Amino acid sequence: MAKTLNSRIPEGPVAEKWTNYKAHQRLVNPKNKLKLDVIVVGTGLAGASAAASLGEMGFNILNFCIQDSPRRAHSIAAQGGINAAKNYQNDGDSVYRLFYDTVKGGDYRAREANVYRLAEVSNDIIDQCVAQGVPFAREYGGMLANRSFGGAQVSRTFYAKGQTGQQLLLGAYSSLSRMVEAGKVKLFTRYEMEDIVIVDGHARGIIAKNLITGKLERFSANAVVIATGGYGNAYFLSTNAMGCNCTAAIQCYRKGADFANPSYVQIHPTCIPVHGTNQSKLTLMSESLRNDGRIWVPKKIEDAKALQAGTKKGSDIPEEDRDYYLERRYPAFGNLVPRDVASRAAKERCDKGFGVNNTGLAVFLDFSESINRLGIDVILQRYGNLFDMYEEITDVNPGELANEINGVKYCNPMMIFPAIHYTMGGIWVDYELMTTIPGLFAIGECNFSDHGANRLGASALMQGLADGYFVLPYTIQNYLADQALWPKLSTDLPEFAEAEAGVQKEIDRLMGIQGKRSVDSIHKELGHILWEHVGMGRTKEGLEEGLKKMKALREEFNKNLFIPGKKEGLNVELDKAIHLRDFILMGELIAYDALHRNESCGGHFREEYQTEEGEAKRDDANFFYVGCWEYQGNDTTAPVLNKEPLEYEAIKVQTRNYKN
């Protein structure tokens, strides 16, 4: 039976909720903290910052990661920057404006109170990272530098060249290492969570697999924190690292944690296009490039055909024959419109035949104007590593002078096209970041809470560090205040034995199928189904067809999967098979949510619901809520939809406008 979920948002004006919450929350006595264990699954920005912060507070932390070092978490791949409302540029920024831009960018589908809190703590994040030694770019006088990202008309993004995620992760890792050395954090590398253990209705531990030995192990704690990222790799081709998966999140869903807004999947507009059928992942080109790069396609269809045939290059087309379509359609924001808007605009041009590569699925990102105006040295100082990465992959140097027409110098433009990048949906959490399972918390990308239907660029790093450094350390105490009275749990309890036996039984089942198809071949088919039917453009008929195909693919997976090797020891194909099992269920969840939401908003675009100009058309009367899906006991039964009504008090809900 459908339920209405309680987000437990504090009373009072939105600007005072977090301050009031902190003033009245329950605390844990310092001596009692020494008795309490917390499991943190994941060592990316959210997980590492949470583990380090909770360890500093005195809690005993068990921290798990699938890599051989926390430094290999996918947060390291983030390029462009991190948002904060410091207003160093004196350009009109404020906590409220960051809050407003984030809610608007999310197409008014985010929880207002959470977003304001995020904007409020953003400035503390920068101070924390500077104190850790993160080498943010600086102006000549020593002040931290800023640049702009999509969906904003101010410069609020702090950055470290094109390697911001790496530097922020090294900062969090240094704090984590300090706690490991102090004995407050016990780090388990090359371990993967396979199940959550529920005791008396509370999350009290996990079953984890040692990825080297293949052995299953039991771990108990007073609370469990999931920080395992998003589910973009369900699509097979994405900008996510190949190890990224949704197994921990899906296991929590199977055990009773509602999954919120799974259809909100972000398709990033600036990625290197697909170049072959055997490709295993895609490469992101940072949104920061849109500060100085201009996106265009030819105005003339004959020029587009020549580009597709390889008889012309981008540098051969003069300025007057270029269509800078984002600047034309959205003059107030130009190339810095939000990601969902830029991606759909690129798709529209390519669908009309104006694509610029041999597949017709690419547009140009051109730096000629900026290089002519500022000089190549300035551009390389800002984006040098990104230019190097692009050249390494494509053998094209986007900073190299390639042609001169009527006195105007033109460089080789980058070719880009939208690709799966980030997931705004995730495990449902309340204001305290606790799921529908008491004692189970979800932070960072694996929860749904802050971005609505579309995340603004440079806000993922902000949310991950906000949750780990400044939100969870407060809110988890409200739960743990009672736990200090509980006895330490033994992993010999029947709930732990039952959970471990369930995982072992599933491993035996997968190893015993002994079919003929590899994990990758089935995963690639799943990705094709999702991209074709649950991708940038969605329809009722397409979603129903996608669901039908995914159900058939599950049967194929269960009958014809082949996993080489044995269950003991290191077996990467077995681990991938477990991930794929969960990606299939995740793909169905995305489709169910997209099918029920008869509107277009942010990253969810139903082609039946659009304006005459091709923009997203929301239905606030019927869909102004968080869609929360509840598992029904097995993977083949359709989930039940629960709802969390959205309430806005500080912002007027209106149609997004990036034109003026």
Regions found by a protein language model. Give the residues of each.
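Glycine- and aromatic-enriched mobile tails/lids
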Residues: 20, 26-28, 32-37, 50-53, ...
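Core beta-strand elements of the Rossmann-like FAD/NAD(P) dinucleotide-binding domain
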Residues: 34-36, 214-223, 436
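Glycine-rich Rossmann-fold phosphate-binding loop(s) that bind the pyrophosphate
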Residues: 42-44
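N-terminal Rossmann-fold NAD(P) dinucleotide-binding loop
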Residues: 47
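Conserved N-terminal glycine-rich FAD pyrophosphate-binding loop of Rossmann-like flavoproteins
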Residues: 68-100, 266-270, 279-281
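Conserved redox-cofactor binding core of oxidoreductases
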Residues: 128-215, 227, 271-285, 290
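Glycine-rich loop(s) and the adjacent beta-strand/alpha-helix scaffold that form part
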Residues: 223-282, 451-474
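An anion/pyrophosphate-binding glycine-rich loop and adjacent beta-alpha core
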Residues: 251, 257-403, 474-477
